[in-house]
Structure formats: structure tokens, C-alpha cells
């Protein structure tokens, strides 16, 4: 804002950002000992629900490499800016290392009802969500290494790949929010990193990078 106030030219897509699912209880500032392990990127192998107990996106739309940078923003749109990634015991071995750090926001329970109570969601609604999801899964082979088309039918949002029933206790829920890595908007610069005015002339002594 200080640069804009002295006449710097804005540039880029200011309403967009690189946004990931980030541990809800992570600190406000980074920890070099943990680095990026507060991210939570194994969501394709479970379901994602908001505080109302409702799914709100296709967890298996594509490999996480192609969805993780935009799904954080979808969490940001949810009530209280929080969501829960839910897994059961049979997918536990598929979770990335970041799910095992001591600081992780994790809740476990032996039933969906108990899990819901522990994370502050209506047990009735979460049980209904999980039941509808489980009953909608097409009976095809599961393969985590490819787009296996093991999908749901008849529910919205769908899950396009890696749809396994959530039916094997214990169940785990990981609280996530949106972590913004960087925005897509900034200041226009030239090849020497000088910040430009609206007429494309450089502002003396003002440089930008990053």
C-alpha cells in the first residue's frame, strides 16, 4: 500500500492467490523446524466437510498436484473458514508425513457420531453425509497411483476418483483452514526490478522482487 500511495503501478490478478489447506491450529508465523508440514494434502483419499457437516468439493477431481493450490480458497469460503479432512483406518497408510507431526490438529474416534461430537459437528448430519457418500460409490477397483474412476454417482458434489467408503474405525479428522502462500497481484517492475509509475517510468529508489 505504501508503494501505491507514492504512485506505483499495480499489476497482476489481485483477487487470486496460491492457497492451500493448512493446519487450523498452526502458529501465525512459520517454524523452520516444521517448514511446510502444516500443509495437509492427502485429501483425495478421504472426504472434506465443513463445520455444518457437508461436503463442498470434489476431493478426487484430479491428482493433488493439480488441485491443492486452489482448494485452500474453497475452505476459506466455508463457515468459520474451517473444514475437516476425514479418513478411516484403511487409508491411514496413504497419508503423507505431514499428518504425523506432533503439532497436528487431529481427532480420532471409533464411530462417526463420536467423531462429530469431538469436532463440533452435528452427529446426525455428519452420519448422514458419510452414509450418503458410502452408498453412492461405484463398485470398481481402487488404485491410488492413477485416476482410477472409482467414483460416486447420484450425489453432489461428486467424487471423481479414489472414492472409498468411510467405514473402518478408528476414524480421524484433521482440522484445516486456508493458508495463502502468495497472492497473484503486486507491483509492475522493469527488468532492473525498479517499480514503475502508471506512465511506466521508474520510481527513483524503489525496487521490488518476489
Per-region residue spans from a language model:
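Residues forming the flavin
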Residues: 1-148, 152-210
Amino acid at each position: 500500500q505504501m508503494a501505491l500511495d507514492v504512485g506505483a503501478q499495480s499489476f497482476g490478478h489481485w483477487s487470486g492467490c496460491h492457497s492451500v489447506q493448512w493446519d487450523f491450529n498452526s502458529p501465525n508465523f512459520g517454524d523452520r523446524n516444521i517448514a511446510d508440514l502444516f500443509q495437509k494434502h492427502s485429501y483425495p483419499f478421504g472426504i472434506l466437510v465443513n463445520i455444518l457437516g457437508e461436503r463442498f468439493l470434489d476431493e478426487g477431481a484430479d491428482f493433488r498436484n493439480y488441485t491443492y493450490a486452489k482448494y485452500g480458497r474453497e475452505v476459506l469460503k466455508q463457515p468459520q473458514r474451517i473444514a475437516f479432512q476425514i479418513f478411516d483406518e484403511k487409508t491411514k497408510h496413504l497419508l503423507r508425513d505431514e499428518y504425523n507431526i506432533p503439532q497436528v490438529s487431529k481427532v480420532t474416534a471409533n464411530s462417526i457420531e463420536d467423531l462429530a461430537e469431538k469436532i463440533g459437528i452435528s452427529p446426525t448430519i455428519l452420519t448422514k453425509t458419510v452414509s450418503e457418500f458410502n452408498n453412492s460409490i461405484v463398485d470398481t477397483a481402487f488404485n491410488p497411483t492413477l485416476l482410477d474412476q472409482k467414483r460416486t454417482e447420484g450425489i453432489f458434489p461428486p467424487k471423481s476418483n479414489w472414492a472409498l467408503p468411510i467405514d473402518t474405525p478408528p476414524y480421524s479428522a484433521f482440522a484445516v483452514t486456508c493458508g495463502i502462500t502468495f497472492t497473484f497481484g503486486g507491483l509492475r517492475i522493469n527488468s532492473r526490478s525498479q517499480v514503475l509509475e502508471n506512465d511506466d517510468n521508474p520510481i527513483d529508489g524503489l525496487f521490488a522482487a518476489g
